[in-house]
């Protein structure tokens, strides 16, 4: 996953350092978004023109804007599938023995350091940090699914 993101960033690198167009091209630019002009600014007389001038971005630059809302919404089944996928990739876990109720130490034969590595992998997968106090309590995949669903406000 990280290598794909890095490759995509490196491919876009030459475009990021391309010279910006000169002023006549900026005059032909279209507004990027109305979210750049909040409601309060739009109501003030004379402020709309200056806000629109700031909101105009050349067309060659607009394709570099990143869209964070492109990710699909999380569901409990999606979280469970991602947790099990990450665990199946872990070399010390036998995929045949793995289920959502498998205890890391009792059923899968892992130790505390393996559990820490699993929690770190989950942090990387879901993009947020799990405090050590909470991480010590997560001893099976279902507990990890429940914890992530609680933190990301995912309910059925």
Curated annotation (Swiss-Prot):
InterPro entries, alphabetized: ACP, ACP-like_sf, PP-bd_ACP, Ppantetheine_attach_site
Cellular compartments annotated: Mitochondrion
A GO molecular-function annotation: structural molecule activity
GO annotations of cellular component type: iron-sulfur cluster assembly complex; mitochondrial [2Fe-2S] assembly complex; mitochondrial inner membrane; mitochondrion; nucleoplasm; respiratory chain complex I
Sequence positions bearing N6-acetyllysine: 88
Principal subcellular localization: mitochondrion
Modified residues (O-(pantetheine 4'-phosphoryl)serine): 112
Post-translational modifications: Phosphopantetheinylation at Ser-112 is essential for interactions with LYR motif-containing proteins.
Keywords attached to this entry: Acetylation, Electron transport, Fatty acid biosynthesis, Fatty acid metabolism, Lipid biosynthesis, Lipid metabolism, Mitochondrion, Phosphopantetheine, Phosphoprotein, Respiratory chain, Transit peptide, Transport
Transit peptide residue numbers: 1-68
GO biological processes: [2Fe-2S] cluster assembly; aerobic respiration; fatty acid biosynthetic process; iron-sulfur cluster assembly; proton motive force-driven mitochondrial ATP synthesis
Disulfide cysteine pairs (residue numbers): none
Matching Pfam families: PP-binding (PF00550)
Domain named Carrier: residues: 77-152
Keyword Nucleus: no
PANTHER family linked: ACYL CARRIER PROTEIN, ACYL CARRIER PROTEIN, MITOCHONDRIAL
NCBIfam families: acyl_carrier
Protein role: Carrier of the growing fatty acid chain in fatty acid biosynthesis. Accessory and non-catalytic subunit of the mitochondrial membrane respiratory chain NADH dehydrogenase (Complex I), which functions in the transfer of electrons from NADH to the respiratory chain. Accessory protein, of the core iron-sulfur cluster (ISC) assembly complex, that regulates, in association with LYRM4, the stability and the cysteine desulfurase activity of NFS1 and participates in the [2Fe-2S] clusters assembly on the scaffolding protein ISCU.
Family designation: Belongs to the acyl carrier protein (ACP) family.
Subunit-structure text: Mammalian complex I is composed of 45 different subunits. Interacts with ETFRF1. Identified in a complex composed of MALSU1, MIEF1 upstream open reading frame protein and NDUFAB1; within the trimeric complex, MIEF1 upstream open reading frame protein functions as a bridging scaffold that interacts with MALSU1 on one side, and with NDUFAB1 on the other side. The complex interacts with the mitochondrial large ribosomal subunit. Interacts with alpha-1-microglobulin chain; this interaction is required for the maintenance of mitochondrial redox homeostasis.
Protein name: Acyl carrier protein, mitochondrial
């Amino acid at each position: 996953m990280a290598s794909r993101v890095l490759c995509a960033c490196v491919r876009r690198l030459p475009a990021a350092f391309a010279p910006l167009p000169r002023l006549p091209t900026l005059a032909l630019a279209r507004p990027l978004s109305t979210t750049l002009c909040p409601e309060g600014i739009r109501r003030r007389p004379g402020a709309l023109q200056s806000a629109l001038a700031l909101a105009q971005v050349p067309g060659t630059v607009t394709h570099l804007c990143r869209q964070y809302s492109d990710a699909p919404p999380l569901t409990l089944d999606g979280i469970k599938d991602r947790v099990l996928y990450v665990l199946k990739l872990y070399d010390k876990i036998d995929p045949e023995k793995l289920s959502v109720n498998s205890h890391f130490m009792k059923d899968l034969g892992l130790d505390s350091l393996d559990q820490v590595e699993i929690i770190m992998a989950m942090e990387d997968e879901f993009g947020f940090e799990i405090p050590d106090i909470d991480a010590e309590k997560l001893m099976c995949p279902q507990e990890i699914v429940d914890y992530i669903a609680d933190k990301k406000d995912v309910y059925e």
